[in-house]
């Protein structure tokens, strides 16, 4: 399994409005699907099990301010299976940004999606044609103010037969 991580360095000076995290998560799915369509790849749809997987891990990253695909001692595949996602394909993108100032909803989503698009490994995950499901979470650390983002991609085992 390939593992990729990246850091987003944002400079959005003077932005005072706080991001609506649920809207950011929706916008990440929309931005991902827009990118997939531009590249001739079908859409991914939100999956509740992958959403729970992404949320649990993003919350862990934000709580501990650790940043690694295995930060909790588990792989993305093990985390997905623990939430009931029986897969033949699973992949994970993670990101965080260093700037703890306020962000608009659209700016935060746009920067996260663009960062993944610009990273070869994350781009591969985003454009994996066999992936049909996604789960997204964005959580802000109470300690550092960093935003941690997790995007899961997958395909259920039943769909691979």
Label the model's feature ranges.
Residues 8, 48, 138:
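Residues that line or immediately flank small-molecule/substrate-binding pockets and catalytic motifs
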Residues 77-157:
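A well-ordered secondary-structure block
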Residues 19-83, 129, 133-135:
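Short, well-ordered surface patches within globular domains
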Residues 4-13:
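Sec-dependent N-terminal signal peptides
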Residues 14-18:
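Sec/Tat signal peptide C-region and signal peptidase I cleavage site
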Residues 160-161:
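Short, solvent-exposed mixed-charge patches
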């Amino acid at each position: 399994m390939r593992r990729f991580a990246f850091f987003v360095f944002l400079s959005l000076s003077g932005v005072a409005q706080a991001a609506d995290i649920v809207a950011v998560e929706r916008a990440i799915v929309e931005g991902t699907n827009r990118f997939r369509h531009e590249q001739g790849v079908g859409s991914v749809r939100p999956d509740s099990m992958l959403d729970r997987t992404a949320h649990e891990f993003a919350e862990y990253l934000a709580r501990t301010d650790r940043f690694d695909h295995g930060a909790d001692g588990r792989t993305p595949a093990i985390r997905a299976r623990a939430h009931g996602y029986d897969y033949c394909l699973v992949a994970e993108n993670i990101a965080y940004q260093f700037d703890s100032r306020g962000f608009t909803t659209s700016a935060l989503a746009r920067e996260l999606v663009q960062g993944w698009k610009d990273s070869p490994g994350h781009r591969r995950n985003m454009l994996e044609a066999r992936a049909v499901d996604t789960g997204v979470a964005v959580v802000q650390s109470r300690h550092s103010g960093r935003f941690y983002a997790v995007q899961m991609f997958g395909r259920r085992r039943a769909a691979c037969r």
